[in-house]
Amino acid sequence: MSSDRACMLCGIVQTTNEFTRDGCPNCQGIFEEASVSAIECTSPSFEGLVGMCKPTKSWVAKWISVEQYVPGMYAIKVDGRLPVEVVDLLPHYKPRDGSQVD
């Protein structure tokens, strides 16, 4: 059984232990402001993986909206819903579960 999870906000994939110990390297400040834990904002259900070495120089990073994030493995689609406390802080939030169509 895999212990990998993906952040529902940025899509980075890490182990459950990494999220528990360190939080999300991209979104932890938002989670703290919303008074929620990183685990509440992650999902074990995700699809597709993209490795980002240089997100600022990658067209794929731009396509999946991770160009401003740290290098790492990112999920293309993440199932689940962020806590309302987080969504309320983000006026331009786009879910990573594919439910919002541009």
Swiss-Prot record:
GO biological process: 7-methylguanosine mRNA capping; heterochromatin formation; intracellular mRNA localization; negative regulation of autophagy; negative regulation of transcription elongation by RNA polymerase I; positive regulation of transcription elongation by RNA polymerase I; positive regulation of transcription elongation by RNA polymerase II; regulation of rRNA processing
InterPro entries, A to Z: RPABC4/Spt4 (IPR029040), Spt4 (IPR009287), Spt4/RpoE2_Znf (IPR022800), Spt4_sf (IPR038510)
Main localization, broad class: nucleus
Pfam short name (any one): Spt4
Zn finger residue spans: C4-type: 7-27
CDD domains: Spt4 (cd07973)
GO CC, any one term: kinetochore
Signal peptide: none
Nucleus recorded as keyword: yes
An example molecular function term from Gene Ontology annotations: protein-containing complex binding
Keywords: Centromere, Chromosome, Metal-binding, mRNA processing, Nucleus, Transcription, Zinc, Zinc-finger
Segments traversing the membrane: none
Localisation per UniProt entry: Nucleus; Chromosome, Centromere
Family the UniProt entry places it in: Belongs to the SPT4 family.
Described purpose of this protein according to its UniProt entry: The SPT4-SPT5 complex mediates both activation and inhibition of transcription elongation, and plays a role in pre-mRNA processing. This complex seems to be important for the stability of the RNA polymerase II elongation machinery on the chromatin template but not for the inherent ability of this machinery to translocate down the gene.
Subunit structure: Component of the SPT4-SPT5 complex. Interacts with RNA polymerase II.
Record-given protein name: Transcription elongation factor SPT4
Lineage start: Eukaryota, Fungi, Dikarya, Ascomycota, Saccharomycotina
